[in-house]
Amino acid sequence: MTYFVLFLGLCFVLGGLAVASNPSPYYGVVGLVLASVAGCGWFLSLGASFVSLVLFMVYLGGMLVVFVYSVSLAADPFPEAWGDWQVIGYGMGFAMVLVVGVVIGGFVESWNFGVVTVDSVGMFSVRLDFSGVAMFYSWGAGMFLVAGWGLLLTLFVVLELVRGLSRGAIRAV
């Protein structure tokens, strides 16, 4: 199980690296899917099944819509590939930043802050993950309505921007 969690962490970091150094929006979608699946699997291995499911639905349901619009607006006739020297340079630069972060993180880890889990303690306790469901729908109902209206307004704004003056989709020239 430890190796699987380490593998998910490595996939999450590589997915974030792929999103940050993508040569075109087509490859950014692949990196986002890899990072979201690995991150949600990581949460699932920690026992946060509801949070993992909600984040998976948000990332793959909402963020991929943003990438679809960005791909349609920035469609290149000759997109760059992963093997181009500029993309490899970006990847190496981000990898160096990650290595420096791991070195600094090893220094900070020596301070020993402890490990935080999502399970409650006791025989008749409700898991903190599932008690969050009740808080989402009781205290956060107004915020859900405001966020829903904001997303609907954003959808209409993006549709108007894509439509343009010619009453059709924007095409690459």
Swiss-Prot record:
Membrane topology term: Multi-pass membrane protein
The keyword Membrane is assigned to this record: yes
Catalytic activity: a ubiquinone + NADH + 5 H(+)(in) = a ubiquinol + NAD(+) + 4 H(+)(out)
InterPro entries: ComplexI_Subunit6, NADH_UbQ/plastoQ_OxRdtase_su6, Nuo/plastoQ_OxRdtase_6_NuoJ
Residues passing through the membrane, by range: 1-21, 27-47, 48-68, 87-107, 139-159
Localisation per UniProt entry: Mitochondrion membrane
EC number(s) per entry: 7.1.1.2
Assigned keywords, A-Z: Electron transport, Membrane, Mitochondrion, NAD, Respiratory chain, Translocase, Transmembrane, Transmembrane helix, Transport, Ubiquinone
GO terms for MF: NADH dehydrogenase (ubiquinone) activity
A GO-annotated cellular component: mitochondrial membrane
Family designation: Belongs to the complex I subunit 6 family.
Function field: Core subunit of the mitochondrial membrane respiratory chain NADH dehydrogenase (Complex I) that is believed to belong to the minimal assembly required for catalysis. Complex I functions in the transfer of electrons from NADH to the respiratory chain. The immediate electron acceptor for the enzyme is believed to be ubiquinone.
Entry protein name: NADH-ubiquinone oxidoreductase chain 6
Organism: Brachyramphus brevirostris
Lineage, broadest ranks: Eukaryota, Metazoa, Chordata, Craniata, Vertebrata
